[in-house]
């Protein structure tokens, strides 16, 4: 949401420049150099947010309705859906309010708009942080279920999962308020970037280790049944492809946004960096796309959840 003044807010006003006519083309930056700028139409931005909102509401509803899904794993998946819901909802609200203000359909005092902007920024930042945390929590949960299968139910209990969820939400809100309050400090932006890289490394290490264990297990079964080596290789290739897609989507959807934050610290006035800054709305749209993809990867693959979802949809009609 636009804020008066030359300073940029961490989330709300990094995109404070009014949206130009939607296009994909070359725009001139302040030095006259040509750079690629991708403008996201407001309608597309709102549509992506709405799809994500509906998807994640369905996931939360299905998990809440079915007591069989009240397990630690689904607790993390439900909270991931709630985080993605808030990411999409807060960005939709910000876009809608901005459009109404620009069109003159909504009259509000500057102080009220500023307070609303602060609230939306905190919600957006905290939901982004919690979303990354819950992606990491799901990876840790799956890792424990594979490498400590016999002790899993004693290690990952529902009370512990609830305490972890509460800690993640509280930490996300507190740190987001801190980040918003000190948005103009380079250390704040670097902390966010380091946090993203830490989550990326954590997920990569855990999932690669899980893939290696799965390949060893498949190789053992193949030897037991005296199968040919290509069958094991096929399993390994399939697992590697799945892992590449999972981590690739995570990096492609979240990476540009954190690259944006990194460049704000490293080269805020450089012409090339200025070109990248013009695509902030595209980076936010990619995060919303990730919120659309998350339910497909982590939730809708569950047969029990899909069955509950069908019941919810049939009852709603």
UniProtKB/Swiss-Prot annotation:
The chain crosses the membrane at residues 38-63, 73-93, 119-140, 164-183, 192-211, 241-266, 280-300. InterPro entries: GPCR_Rhodpsn, GPCR_Rhodpsn_7TM, Melcrt_ACTH_rcpt, MSH_rcpt. Residues 1-37, 94-118, 184-191, 267-279 are extracellular. One of its GO terms (molecular function) is melanocyte-stimulating hormone receptor activity. CDD domains: 7tmA_MC1R. A lipid is attached at residue 315 (S-palmitoyl cysteine). It is a multi-pass membrane protein. Receptor for MSH (alpha, beta and gamma) and ACTH. The activity of this receptor is mediated by G proteins which activate adenylate cyclase. Mediates melanogenesis, the production of eumelanin (black/brown) and phaeomelanin (red/yellow), via regulation of cAMP signaling in melanocytes. Interacts with MGRN1, but does not undergo MGRN1-mediated ubiquitination; this interaction competes with GNAS-binding and thus inhibits agonist-induced cAMP production. Interacts with OPN3; the interaction results in a decrease in MC1R-mediated cAMP signaling and ultimately a decrease in melanin production in melanocytes. This is Melanocyte-stimulating hormone receptor. The lineage of its organism: Eukaryota, Metazoa, Chordata, Craniata, Vertebrata.
């Amino acid at each position: 949401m636009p804020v008066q003044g030359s300073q940029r807010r961490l989330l709300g006003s990094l995109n404070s420049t009014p949206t130009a006519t939607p296009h994909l083309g070359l725009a001139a930056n302040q030095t006259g150099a040509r750079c690629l700028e991708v403008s996201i139409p407001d309608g597309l931005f709102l549509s992506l947010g709405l799809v994500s909102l509906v998807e994640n509401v369905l996931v939360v509803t299905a998990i809440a309705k079915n007591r069989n899904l009240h397990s630690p794993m689904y607790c993390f998946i439900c909270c991931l859906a709630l985080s993605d819901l808030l990411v999409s909802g807060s960005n939709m609200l910000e876009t809608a309010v901005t459009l109404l203000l620009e069109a003159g359909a909504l009259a509000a005092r500057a102080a009220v708009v500023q307070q609303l902007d602060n609230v939306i920024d905190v919600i957006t930042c905290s939901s982004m942080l919690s979303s990354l945390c819950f992606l990491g929590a799901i990876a840790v949960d799956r890792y424990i279920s594979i490498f400590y299968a016999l002790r899993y139910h004693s290690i990952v209990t529902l009370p512990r999962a609830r305490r972890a969820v509460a800690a993640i939400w509280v930490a996300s809100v507190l740190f987001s308020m801190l980040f918003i309050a000190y948005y103009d400090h380079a250390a704040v932006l670097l902390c966010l970037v380091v946090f993203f890289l830490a989550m990326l490394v954590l997920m990569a290490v855990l999932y690669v280790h899980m893939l290696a264990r799965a390949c060893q297990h498949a190789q053992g079964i193949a030897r037991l049944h005296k199968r040919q080596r290509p069958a094991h290789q096929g399993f390994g290739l399939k697992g590697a492809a799945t892992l590449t897609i999972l981590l690739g989507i995570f990096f492609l959807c979240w990476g540009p946004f954190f690259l944006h934050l990194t460049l704000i610290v490293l080269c805020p006035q450089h012409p090339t960096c200025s070109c990248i800054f013009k695509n902030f709305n595209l980076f936010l749209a990619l995060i919303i796309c990730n919120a659309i993809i998350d339910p497909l990867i982590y939730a809708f693959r569950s047969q029990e959840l899909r069955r509950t979802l069908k019941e919810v949809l049939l009852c709603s009609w």
